[in-house]
Amino acid sequence: MKQLTSAQIRQMWLDFWKSKGHAVEPSANLVPVNDPTLLWINSGVATLKKYFDGSVIPENPRITNSQKAIRTNDIENVGKTARHHTMFEMLGNFSVGDYFRDEAIEWGYELLTSPEWFDLPKDKLYMTYYPDDKDSYNRWIACGVEPSHLIPIEDNFWEIGAGPSGPDTEIFFDRGEEFDPDNIGIRLLEEDIENDRYIEIWNIVLSQFNADPAVPRSEYKELPNKNIDTGAGLERLAAVMQGAKTNFETDLFMPIIREIEKMSGKAYDPDGETLSFKVIADHIRSLAFAIGDGALPGNEGRGYVLRRLLRRAVMHGRRLGISDAFLYKLVPTVGQIMESYYPEVLEKRDFIEKIVKREEETFARTIDAGSSMLDELLANLKKSGKDTLEGKDIFKLYDTYGFPVELTEELAEDEGFKIDHEGFKAAMKEQQDRARASVVKGGSMGMQNETLANITEPSEFLYEAETAESRLSVIVADDARHDSVNSGQALLVFEQTPFYAEMGGQVADHGTISDAAGTTVARVVDVQRAPNGQALHTVEVEGELVVGANYKLEIDHSRRHRVMKNHTATHLLHAALHNIVGNHAVQAGSLNEQEFLRFDFTHFEAVTPEELRAIEEQVNEEIWKATPVTTIETDIDTAKSMGAMALFGEKYGKRVRVVSIGDYSVELCGGTHVANTAEIGMFKIIKEEGIGSGTRRILAVTSREAYLAYREEEDALKSIAATLKAPQLKEVPNKVASLQEQLHALQKENATLKEKAAAAAAGDVFKDVKEANGVRYIASQVEVSDAGALRTFADQWKQADYSDVLVLAAHIREKVNVLVASKSENVHAGNLIKVLAPIVSGRGGGKPDMAMAGGSDANSIQDLLSAVAEQF
């Protein structure tokens, strides 16, 4: 049997099938494109659906690939089994209506056993087949396989509901009796017993029938065009061909594990405890590839999967004694292992490292407290003799410390404890109920949830109206329903209303309510949604309001129009962010007020000034195109087929509103918008900032507020121009540049004077030479204005033979700066400063000849200087 690297196995696979007339299909992105049914690409055939369903006809009906894939349905098993991974490579060969069973089996056997190819021992190969599939049995016999190596298995039939289906034949490699401690032998295969002896290395699916759940399998009709779909795990083949005990001991994982050994100072022992090494090695592969393919850690969907993987790996790093961020340092190793076929990991190394490191640092800020709490909880359980971690405690870990529930469960189970899932769900629901209640109780509503929950009278929002005549159906005041009210504050429900209730980031309308005589009887100061969906108008009562009477409702037209401008501009901003920053920049929150708009979005670094300028310009270009804004109501499926952007976390009914701004922006939105982008007038970004892990915020203004913002900047510029005595604004940059040149010249002159002063002071410092164990050293506290002056001292010290070692300390702006320089081969400056720095509550490091450190305890400077002699 050949000893092949994983790269050689992959290439040999592709070369073999290419020699059989197959086209090599490149590995697709892990993030599915135009396939909402998949979270990740999870198999080799997943990217070829377009061929098998007939929507696209391949140029060549014979296809081969090596496809990266992610499956995360049972993450907790990673590291506990020999072959389970979250990311893996599936080698495949496919026939779309071309060759079938005979060629698939014959060529497969040739690839596995031919000396020219994999050269696996024939006596080590076993095949399972569907009992009624005599054709596959006979074909294996024709290839020379012994009947005793062909095992009929009833489950060897692939089908998922109605549609293409067929028998499959699986190929296993026998690793020998050492992996069969109970000497069960071939029954391991016959009875489908989980084992490490017979390893499945390949599955050939013969898509032959059209499955019909209404009839017995024996009555399935044959497909007019039969297909072949196969999958062989690269990791498993590598383990077999490299003689590895598990997949983790192959060249796909061991370089990563070796790096983890260096970081942890612990050795990986295949016969000992290896779980944490395996988990980290597996998860960093998934993280590196997924982030490289555009997925980012977050709180939902793919992002949550990545965040969960990262946090699980970090926790296992801590088990190995690694407390600092370390996963990002493994990214280059992952890239180097896979470079021959997947160069993109190294190409995107900086970006991937940045994302991983930032996530690690964010998690580290809460993990210590959470770990301590979990340890304490488990210790208390042991003392009390209980075996279940309570749901309220799991929720506190989740809510306060950011511990994923799955991670808490895993760590608890490792210690032999169960967790209370139902209790956790109850605690989560309580929090959600409190959050909903706080929205109802807060602001101007001031009512208990029970009162509002009992309102069942219907209320319709009139999108196109700004005034309406409507019947008053509910009055709530002082925590109770009333038939009438004539003063104070109240909540009103009308059968119909033009008032928009705050929702989707758009603030509520304000306005007035008048009686039949035209007298204003109430002013609307807020509108919120009641628990049953009605619009609750919070009003300041100025006259009598009576249930059952009709009133004229009129919104503040100016306020509504200003809010609409900002809301439509928000849609333009969202589209511009996609175009300029990337599709990962999706909405994480928004607020559309009358004075400004605020937009939160997912992104892992500050948007650059150049990007902000481009975004601003693009939004304004769309405004000045005077594009009509159209709104239609349709069903959710039609909306999605239009390409409408649905915001994650928003709940949509069967009917939705789609807001389109030409071809530039299409979003699902229940808010109100201008009829034409020209109404917005102008758009200006005021500020961009970070507000949390992976979330940025843009504050912007439109229309009159944008003009005022530009005028404010112009006024400030004119003031600067007057100060600089620049007759025209365009001369200000030159004037500022001239001032900067003068400043730099003065700074340079000042630095020269400092150097001279330091040189003069150095003369006294360098005279104070002491000796300890044959090492001449200078240890002194100096008065300097910055750390750079310490380096100046060191540079002068190097010019003459004053001593072997120089140690300087300075108290600069409430901090301690320490420098160590060495000319002695026996004294490493970096090592020496690591010993001295903690004395002043600091840390540092450096090279053998020069090292720096910072600290905070100025009172201990003399202790540090006194300790120098003890180090020689």
From Swiss-Prot:
Its cofactor is Zn(2+). Binds 1 zinc ion per subunit. It is found in: Cytoplasm. The keyword Nucleotide-binding applies. Pfam families: DHHA1, tRNA-synt_2c, tRNA_SAD. It catalyses: tRNA(Ala) + L-alanine + ATP = L-alanyl-tRNA(Ala) + AMP + diphosphate. Its main location: cytoplasm. Its EC number is 6.1.1.7. Transmembrane segments: none annotated. Keywords: Aminoacyl-tRNA synthetase, ATP-binding, Cytoplasm, Ligase, Metal-binding, Nucleotide-binding, Protein biosynthesis, RNA-binding, tRNA-binding, Zinc. GO terms for cellular component: cytosol. GO terms for biological process: alanyl-tRNA aminoacylation. Consists of three domains; the N-terminal catalytic domain, the editing domain and the C-terminal C-Ala domain. The editing domain removes incorrectly charged amino acids, while the C-Ala domain, along with tRNA(Ala), serves as a bridge to cooperatively bring together the editing and aminoacylation centers thus stimulating deacylation of misacylated tRNAs. Belongs to the class-II aminoacyl-tRNA synthetase family. Catalyzes the attachment of alanine to tRNA(Ala) in a two-step reaction: alanine is first activated by ATP to form Ala-AMP and then transferred to the acceptor end of tRNA(Ala). Also edits incorrectly charged Ser-tRNA(Ala) and Gly-tRNA(Ala) via its editing domain. This is Alanine--tRNA ligase. It comes from Streptococcus thermophilus (strain ATCC BAA-250 / LMG 18311). The lineage of its organism: Bacteria, Bacillati, Bacillota, Bacilli, Lactobacillales. The gene is alaS.
